[in-house]
């Protein structure tokens, strides 16, 4: 679970910004609280209030720790342009089964780490300074890595430990594995002037292919019908790719060519909703919130 996130000098965040997920001083609905942290929430604000950039900041971690899909084009102009500081700083705080995990690092662009540190229950277990090329790992089972960790490789040392060691079966290492698993199952998706996602999986599967390949086309039709969108959907293959088409008497049309912007956003929402069965651990979406909230309000008991 996320406890806290802090970012500084990344894109619009000239000064340090902290987003706290602890529920200590607030009265929230109990169903959105887990391990005393907020597990579900909405961040809203006027246009240009940095909501999208906050999402990119939170998901910066997947760039160097995972092999998942990445929105690298969104990380142009990485550093804040009003700040003379040439370093962006990130700090993530998690809690897994009562154990605190703090991961922090600095970068000067999306792909270049300057330093990183991982602590479990206030004990620093991995550290590396990429400028001085010095560091260490204290996790049991990584002894041999200490001979090669101080190299010129730009790879995250946390990622290096995860990919190249057989960790001993102890509580500290289990917490480390839960941290890696959490980051590997984070997902950001959006639908604004274009659709995209990063984290959780790889590839460019279309929404139509994803729904059809999951065997969910009839359920997707029912999903839309319950909202009052009376489409009769069918699968149609075009140039070797599966597409969703709408049938109208003796005619048919590509769903995504006739659907409204709001309906397309619902299709995107549904695409990722049916994947939540695969245990997405952290989800951030930036799409037509009004449409989704109206759906939830109208069909909350469905």
Q: What spans do the regions from the language model cover?
A:
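Phosphate-coordinating catalytic segments in nucleotide- and nucleic-acid-processing enzymes
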Residues: 4, 67-277
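Switch/communication elements of ASCE P-loop NTPase nucleotide-binding domains
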Residues: 1-65, 247-302
């Amino acid at each position: 679970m996320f406890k806290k996130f802090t970012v500084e000098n990344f894109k619009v965040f000239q000064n340090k910004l902290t987003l706290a997920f602890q529920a200590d001083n607030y009265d929230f609905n109990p169903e959105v609280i887990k391990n005393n942290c907020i597990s579900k929430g909405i961040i809203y604000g006027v246009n240009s209030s940095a909501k999208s950039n906050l999402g990119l900041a939170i998901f910066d971690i997947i760039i160097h720790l995972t092999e998942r899909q990445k929105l690298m084009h969104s990380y142009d102009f990485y550093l804040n342009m009003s700040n003379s500081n040439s370093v962006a700083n990130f700090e993530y705080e998690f809690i897994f089964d009562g154990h605190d995990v703090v991961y922090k690092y600095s970068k000067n662009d999306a792909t270049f780490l300057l330093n990183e540190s991982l602590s479990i229950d206030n004990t620093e277990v991995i550290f590396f300074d990429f400028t001085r090329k010095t560091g260490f790992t204290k996790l049991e089972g990584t002894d041999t890595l200490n001979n090669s960790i101080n190299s010129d490789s730009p790879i995250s040392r946390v990622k290096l430990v995860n990919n190249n060691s057989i960790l001993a079966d102890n509580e500290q290492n289990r917490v480390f594995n839960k941290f890696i698993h959490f980051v590997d199952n984070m997902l950001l998706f959006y639908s604004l002037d274009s659709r995209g996602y990063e984290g959780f999986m790889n590839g460019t599967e279309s929404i139509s292919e994803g729904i059809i390949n999951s065997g969910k086309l009839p359920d997707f039709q029912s999903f839309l019908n319950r909202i009052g969108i009376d489409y009769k959907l069918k699968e149609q293959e075009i140039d070797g790719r599966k597409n969703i088409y709408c049938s109208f008497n003796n005619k048919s049309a590509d769903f995504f060519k006739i659907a409204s912007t709001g309906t397309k956003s619902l299709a995107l929402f549904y695409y990722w909703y049916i994947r939540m069965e695969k245990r997405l651990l952290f989800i951030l979406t930036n799409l037509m919130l009004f449409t989704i909230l109206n759906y939830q309000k109208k069909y909350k008991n469905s």
